[in-house]
Amino acid sequence: MKNLTGIFSALLVAFNEDGSINEQGLRQIIRHNIDKMKVDGLYVGGSTGENFMLSTAEKKEIFRIAKDEAKDQIALIAQVGSVNLQEAVELGKYATELGYDCLSAVTPFYYKFSFAEIKHYYDTIIAETGNNMIVYSIPFLTGVNIGVEQFGELYKNPKILGVKFTAGDFYLLERLKKAYPNHLIWAGFDEMMLPAVALGVDGAIGSTFNVNAPRARQIFELTKQGKLAEALAVQHVTNDLIEGILANGLYLTIKELLKLQGVEAGYCREPMTAKATDKQLEVAKALYAKFL
């Protein structure tokens, strides 16, 4: 297994206008991340990949393309989580057979599952696949909050390496790192990377890293070195960019920024708005000129 610390892009997926996967575009996004953004790895099949609007077959196809293009150049994490446990197991087995370095799974959502049910979900995926696991905690979208003691229960399974922490509760983040120093934490909010690194996270997984990974690495390394004023200056610039991206439409804007760099980033998947408006295109061009 490759080193799983550092800067990981949450991989965007290029779609054609009819909603099908644009394989050529997806390969270009992967190459851009490896060759230009110099990321340490890719987090494939997450929210940024518009994953929860895709069929099982489409999710497998994205895993296949990503592994085929990246090969062994960087670390690959496959997000296989689903409210359908059988699908999660099927995807986990497939990604493991492809040679993914680790699995990740979002906490099961929509229904108010008990913690015992959530623990069973992770233990089942691990038992069926034999692969290592990263818990994907994103409570503002799932409504699932896992506490310090509950993480301790999850961590009794030695295959669970840590958590992708996409939450603003930095008290919980600090408590987790103190309680379980041997378990890894990946920051999931790009705009709060500096304080997360100051609290000891081991890496970061972000959507904006598809276009802004060099700055993310600067923040990560400068903060680790204790150069907080310098890191904060880079975080300010990063957050100015993120503010513009969020106001203009997150995934559409990142895809337009990639297109301005010659990457065939394609469309978004409906029911998201598939195509940027003229106004959104103008904003993307302005962001590109100012920040990239």
Swiss-Prot record:
For aceneuramate, which residues are the binding ones? 47-48, 166, 188, 190-191, 207
Entry EC number(s)? 4.1.3.3
From the Swiss-Prot or TrEMBL record, state where the protein is found: Cytoplasm
- Please give the biological process terms from Gene Ontology that the record holds: carbohydrate metabolic process; N-acetylneuraminate catabolic process
Q: In which pathway does it act?
A: Amino-sugar metabolism; N-acetylneuraminate degradation; D-fructose 6-phosphate from N-acetylneuraminate: step 1/5
- GO cellular-component terms in the record? cytosol
Q: Give UniProt keywords alphabetically.
A: Carbohydrate metabolism, Cytoplasm, Lyase, Schiff base
EC class of the enzyme, as a word: lyase
Catalytic residues, per the record, are 136 (proton donor), 164 (schiff-base intermediate with substrate)
Report the catalytic activity: aceneuramate = aldehydo-N-acetyl-D-mannosamine + pyruvate
Looking up InterPro entries in the UniProt record yields:
Aldolase_TIM, DapA-like, NanA, Schiff_base-form_aldolases_AS, Schiff_base-form_aldolases_CS
List each coiled-coil range. Answer: none
SMART domains referenced in this protein's UniProt entry, alphabetically: DHDPS (SM01130)
Q: Which CDD domains match?
A: NAL
Role played = Catalyzes the reversible aldol cleavage of N-acetylneuraminic acid (sialic acid; Neu5Ac) to form pyruvate and N-acetylmannosamine (ManNAc) via a Schiff base intermediate.
Similarity comment text for this entry: Belongs to the DapA family. NanA subfamily.
Full protein name: N-acetylneuraminate lyase
This protein's species is Actinobacillus pleuropneumoniae serotype 5b (strain L20)
Q: Which gene encodes it?
A: nanA
